[in-house]
Amino acid sequence: GSVDLIYSSLAIQWCQNLPQFFAECQRVLKPGGCLQISTLVPGTLTELNSAWALVDDAVHVNAFDELGVVKAAAKSAGLKVSSLVDVPHVVSYLKLKDLMADLKGIGAHNMNQGRSQGLLGKSKYQKLIASYEAYRVDDRLPATYQVLYGSFNNG
């Protein structure tokens, strides 16, 4: 390998093949090189997921890899785990439309099988707003991002 450090921030949750990602990182890292990642894990957008579950049976929130899956993929690629910690980060909004605009603004989209293929109608959106209101605290709507921070070494 020829690279001392690889840094990936909130990108690998979009990878279709996590073992291949880690294998490629291991291949390009110098011996002793370091990979630093942050990625989303289960617990992310639980409020939104639960609110949608009261509206319909479609899958609206991405399924994220468990910490153990990330760890196993890195180890199987020959990387040594230096540290892995997942931390909840809560962002709050005045209105659900603000959360939805943030998600759209960062380019987040539903990657799941079983996702709804149609447009969101006004009636469903009103039901979603009503079900998300159950999470309102101190006049704000929370959105939890469960972020995994990982550090790995090559060799």
PLM feature spans:
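A short acidic, Gly/Pro-enriched loop at the edge of an enzyme's catalytic core
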Residues: 1-6
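Short catalytic micro-motifs in class I SAM-dependent methyltransferases
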Residues: 10-13
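A glycine-rich, hydrophobic loop/mini-helix early in the fold
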Residues: 16
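Amphipathic, non-transmembrane alpha-helical secondary structure
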Residues: 19-23, 54, 97
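A short glycine-rich, Lys/Arg-flanked "PGG" loop and its adjoining helix->strand segment in the class I
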Residues: 19-34
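Conserved catalytic/acceptor-binding region of the Class I
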Residues: 32-96, 106-117
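Conserved Class I S-adenosyl-L-methionine
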Residues: 80-155
